[in-house]
Swiss-Prot record:
Record organism: Neorickettsia sennetsu (strain ATCC VR-367 / Miyayama) (Ehrlichia sennetsu)
Cofactor annotation remark: Binds 1 zinc ion per subunit.
Protein name: Alanine--tRNA ligase
Pfam families: tRNA-synt_2c, tRNA_SAD
Keyword Hydrolase appears in the UniProt entry: no
GO cellular component, one term: cytosol
Gene Ontology MF term list: alanine-tRNA ligase activity; aminoacyl-tRNA deacylase activity; ATP binding; tRNA binding; zinc ion binding
Entry's localization field: Cytoplasm
Similarity-based family: Belongs to the class-II aminoacyl-tRNA synthetase family.
Superkingdom per UniProt: Bacteria
Length: 848
């Protein structure tokens, strides 16, 4: 039903001259005022202001929307009503000067009565009470008259984008679910209840609200309409409850099956809804975190976990239900398939990390609230302790106690939170200049923000506006009328250098910026002293430090760009450090990065560096810069104009210092990639000569390790050889021997197998007899080998040795040169060997 309804809507308007555009991301592309896309018109806001910028004059969309944070927040109602959702789809048709009120009403009426075949008896219309034109068009088209066309005077039927800008009256189509439900016909000060449900809102954008509050006619009036897909699907499926449509029933049924609990329908509704919003947010690059939209996603997942816990289910649930969502919505929203692994990994990690906190936190909450009764209020101090000490979120505390009709002192909680932040800020600033906040504010009121003139200037002149000396030390803090010293900002460490006056030399060690924009210089007195405010001083930055910071900052931009290119658009900065010696970059990514992928990332970075891209900076309007693709940090407060830094395709909003060309970075070497939190990874790297030095040291370390390894191998080989020698020596020594004595000379003969002649020769000194002659035989592959070893006395008888060699020769043996007291002989036949042994025995008898 969902897919069919969506397709029917799109096809109808395409057939009626509209261009279909796919849903935009849930993350507003160029609208820092919004946390999420929460209506179908959000992606087209700029076109209503200037229709000439619209790519098409009439458009139809099925837009993903989330309402779970900020002004539009349905989170707490989800699960307890029939129609509230954190995620929903808005079907819409839009006109940018193409058609207006009459055509918009005609198309809407034709679609609901002819395409959807809704009964006209069930339909009611509302118009803005002053919009006679809309009333007449509706009356002419439907014949309803005042009985079923109601004039509404409240702001509900007059829409405006903001305090100033495009606005106009609205008209709504309501559907009557029947008398069995409570509710009044939609009129002023009457509640339509559950009986009458708004299914389509038509906004006739025909005015511009001016600064004075006056309304001026738009030159090109526009149309913005929105139909809630889930509400209409419920009507077509014959129910007044969105959660009883087939899509939600499929998820709820699977939730019941997996948890084994079919009770507590509210819990299953929460889980089904939150699975949708969490999955689509992750698919659009949002990952759980502690600020902004990332924290809203975390709240959504944690709320689902809380309700799965209430069902008695204590393991990961949402990933086990995702396949149902993908099956029902994945054919139209293919990002669910593309980002499936990221969605499953993120849901799993977030659930696992919160379950322990939830279990212990609920136990503590039960302890502190056990004596409380309906109507009581939990103190902000206790709620804060649960959050600060035990990590138990305030919204979960509120949610749980709400079921028992116990409230929470959220103002008291906010006060404690504010106090903690102030203490933390004071702690961070304790080492900063002791300049009083009064003095900083006084400088700000008189002189404004400190002008920074250091992008191109490495030396300069300035006047001292304020001085604070740290009592009992040579430390002081100075405020200047302008500065070349870049203050610590955006993760980049500050410049250092010197400030020199007529009788003063100061070393600038740290530079900070106050919340007002006043720049403070922490200094150490090298010589002399600062005598008075108003003194003119010379400024000079440490150029080597500045260049190192610039190289590392530009390298960080390139790293960010390459990560988004290789890992996906979900990668966004979560923190950074730009120091002179290294850089550190934290980013959203749920999976570990393989060594192979890390090498490819490093290669891509260096290729961009060596492409010698010019580093270009320009000042732009913030909305224009973001629209043009510049990456900004969510939660960062930007002025109306921003500095845009471009390095090839890497474009970011940035106030930091950078190199002139990418090639000045020289080289990037990634040192490590690690995980610092769930869904957040960290890369640390070095550049330029530091990178080269690291590579050289690594090579030297490898060489040292190789040399050390070779030495160990040689030692092992020597040890093993000794062991082998001992084994062979034992074999020869213990081999069966035949001993014969001829006069004073003993001849020992041994026969061994499986030992080569080389090994036997190497054993000669170890097995040499103290007296007499040792003859060791072994069989080789093609011959018989004999090793004849003489004792020291016989060895001295040169003529005897010569006679032995001659005897071997006459017996058809071959003598091989060897060590002096050893004779090696090889025989091709055994009978030759036997004959030789007999002749040698006779030689011994005749000689000794």
């Amino acid at each position: 039903m969902i897919d069919g309804l969506r397709k029917k809507f799109i096809d109808f308007f395409v057939k009626n001259g509209h261009t279909y555009l796919p849903s935009a991301s849930l993350v507003p592309k160029d609208d820092p005022s919004l946390m999420f896309v929460n209506a179908g018109m959000v992606p087209f806001k700029e076109y209503f202001v200037d229709v000439r910028r619209a790519p098409f004059s009439s458009i139809v969309t099925a837009q993903k929307c989330v309402r779970a944070g900020g002004k539009h927040n349905d989170l707490e109602n989800v699960g307890f009503t029939k129609r509230h959702h954190t995620f929903f789809e808005m079907l819409g048709n839009f006109s940018f000067g193409c058609y207006f009120k009459e055509r918009a009403i005609e198309l809407a009426w034709k679609f609901v009565t002819e395409e959807l075949t809704l009964s006209k008896k069930k339909l009611y219309i509302t118009v803005y009470h002053e919009d006679d034109e809309a009333f007449e068009i509706w009356d002419k088209l439907t014949g309803f008259g005042e009985r079923k066309i109601k004039r509404i005077s409240t702001s509900d039927n007059f829409w405006q984008m903001g305090d100033i800008g495009p606005c106009g009256p609205c008209s709504e189509i309501f559907y009557d679910h029947g008398e069995h439900l409570s509710g009044d016909i939609p009129e002023d000060k009457k509640d339509p209840g559950e009986r009458y449900v708004e299914i389509w809102n038509l906004v006739f954008m025909q005015y511009i609200r001016e600064q004075s509050g006056e309304l001026a006619r738009m030159e090109c009036p526009c149309i913005d309409t929105g139909m809630g897909l889930e509400r209409v699907a419920a009507i077509l499926e014959g129910t007044d409850d969105n959660y009883k449509t087939k899509l939600f029933e499929a998820i709820v049924k699977e939730s019941q099956n997996v948890t084994g609990n079919k009770d507590n329908q509210a819990a299953h509704k929460v889980i089904a809804d939150h699975l949708r919003s969490a999955s689509f947010l992750i698919a659009d690059g949002v990952l759980p975190g502690n600020t902004g939209r990332e924290y809203v996603l975390r709240r959504i997942i944690r709320r689902a976990v809380r309700y799965s816990h209430a069902l008695g289910f204590d393991t990961v649930l949402l990933p086990k239900l995702f396949w149902v969502l993908k099956e029902w919505m994945g054919s139209h929203y293919q990002e669910l398939t593309r980002a499936e692994n990221l969605i499953l990994d993120t849901l799993t990690l977030e659930e696992q990390s919160f379950r322990n906190t939830l279990k212990s936190g609920m136990k503590l909450l039960e302890e502190v609230s056990s004596s409380m009764k309906e109507g009581d209020t939990l103190s902000g101090d206790i709620a804060f302790t649960l959050y600060d000490t035990h990590g138990f979120p305030l919204d979960i505390t509120v949610d749980i106690l709400k079921e028992r009709k116990i409230s929470v002192d959220e103002e008291g909680f906010a006060e404690r939170m504010k106090m903690q932040r102030l203490l933390a800020q004071a702690s961070r600033m304790k080492d900063m200049a002791q300049t009083s906040s009064y003095e900083v504010k006084a400088v700000f009121l008189e002189h404004g923000k400190t002008p920074f003139i250091g992008y191109e200037n490495f030396t300069g002149l300035a006047l001292i506006l304020a001085i604070t000396e740290k009592e009992g030390s040579n430390k002081l803090t100075i405020i200047l009328d302008q500065t070349i010293f870049y203050p610590e900002s955006g993760g980049q460490e500050s410049d250092q250098g010197i400030i020199e006056g007529e009788n003063t030399l100061l070393k600038v060690e740290k530079v900070y910026k106050s919340t007002e924009g006043v720049i403070l210089h922490e200094c150490t007195i090298i010589r002399g002293q600062v005598t008075s405010r108003g003194e003119k001083v010379n400024l000079k930055i440490d150029i080597n430090r500045r260049n190192s910071l610039a190289r590392n900052h530009s390298a960080t931009h390139i790293l960010h760009h390459v990560l988004r290119k290789r890992l996906g658009a979900h990668v966004s900065q979560r923190g950074s450090l730009v120091a002179p010696s290294r850089l550190r970059f934290d980013f959203s990514h749920s999976q570990s990065i393989t060594e192979e992928e890390l090498s490819k990332i490093e290669d891509c970075i260096n290729l961009m560096i060596w492409d010698d891209h010019p580093v270009m900076t320009e000042i732009k309007k913030t909305d224009e810069a973001i629209r043009d693709g510049a990456i900004g940090l969510f939660g960062e407060k930007y002025d109306d104009t921003v500095r845009v830094v471009s390095i090839g395709e890497a474009v970011e909003l940035c106030g930091g210092t950078h190199v002139k060309k990418s090639s000045a970075i020289g080289l990037v070497k990634i040192l490590s990639a690690s995980s610092v939190a769930h869904g957040v990874r960290r890369i640390e790297a070095v550049t330029h000569l530091t990178a080269l030095q690291y590579i050289r040291e690594a090579e030297q370390a490898q060489l040292y390790q190789l040399t050390e390894h070779q030495a160990k191998l040689k030692a092992m080989q020597k040890s093993h050889q000794k062991e082998i020698t001992r084994v062979y020596q034992s074999i020869v020594t213990n081999a069966e021997a035949r001993t014969e004595r001829y006069g004073s000379v003993e001849i020992i003969t041994k026969n061994v197998q499986g030992i080569s002649k080389e090994i036997l020769l190497s054993l000669a000194s170890e097995i040499r007899p103290k007296t007499g002659v040792l003859i060791v035989h072994t069989e080789l592959s093609e011959a018989l080998y004999s090793l004849i070893i003489l004792d020291k006395e016989i060895f001295k008888n040169i003529s005897f040795i010569d006679s032995m060699k001659e005897t071997i020769d006459k017996s058809h043996g071959k003598v091989t040169p060897s060590v002096p007291y050893v004779i090696q002989a090889t025989f091709s036949k055994k009978e030759d060997l036997d004959r030789c042994l007999k002749n040698l025995s006779e030689l011994v008898v005749s000689t000794f």
